[in-house]
Amino acid sequence: AVLPFVETHAAQTGCGFVSNLKTSLEIGSSPHITSGASVDVIMRNVVYALLPVCAFAVYAFGIGAALVLVTALASCLATEHVICRMTGKKSTTGDWSVAITGLLYGLTLPPGLPLWMVAVGGVFAVAVGKALFGGLGYHAFNPALVGRAFLQAAFPQSMTHWSLPFADDRFTSIPSSVMAFPFAEPVYDAVTAATPLAQMKFQSIQAENPALLWGLTAGSTGETGFALIFLGGAYLAARNMLNWRIPISIMLTASLISWVFMQIDPVAYPRPAFT
């Protein structure tokens, strides 16, 4: 938008000279100071940082995790394309932003979640979490988390079933719950596991540091590979696409608060490394 011209008149004493100063002010959305890197370049590098996490998720949870990730990505891409066509806009599926949404959304889901639920959540993430607010740069919440929150509210039982990582048959069989028919009660495998957070909350059991670091615990598809998540963040920081002070400040603050509470009751509250 362009503001109306601002007109000022300055009279110069003694000579009667009057000058008209007209200034055009433009209002645009952030960022106002850029690094010179395009949106495509930044988004593509974020995808690169996520790929090792996705690969580890497939390695740890097998075919089920791969199907969840592919379905999440495909549903988000398809929804973005359809919405662009319906609104008469050029398809934005090539700017990598919706690919990030699809990958992040898939990485937050249980590896045994039925694929039809994954697809429904992907549609909701893009249609409501992103497009409803005006698209890239205008959404109030992370679209991937909007999709996950929707599934958590709509299907709480399915969103709290966790597969055991590194199962012997993870590459030779597909979890029965993944292929469940829409709105049918999914049948989960007998072998399930509690997340470290659930074990700490209900049993006061803290997972060992090596297990947390190398992803030897149950959890969402992409949350267990902490080492690779950390390396992905370091890659983005090295490329000047991430302010390293923000995640480091969050981790240090969480560790400090955890340490304070651990001093009060070391049984009820986890150690800083767990947090």
Region annotations inferred by a language model:
Residues 2, 6, 14-77, 84:
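N-terminal signal-anchor module of multipass membrane proteins
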Residues 78-90, 126-137, 231-240:
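C-terminal ends of transmembrane helices
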Residues 97-98, 103-174:
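Membrane-interface helix-loop-helix junctions at boundaries between adjacent transmembrane segments
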Residues 44-47, 67, 71, 222-236:
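Hydrophobic alpha-helical transmembrane segments
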Residues 238-275:
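Alpha-helical transmembrane segments
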Residues 45-53, 68-80, 97-102, 106, ...:
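Alpha-helical transmembrane segments in multi-pass membrane proteins
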Residues 63-74, 112-120, 217-225, 269-275:
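Structural signature of hydrophobic alpha-helical transmembrane segments
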Residues 141-229:
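Long hydrophobic alpha-helical segments that form multi-pass transmembrane helix bundles
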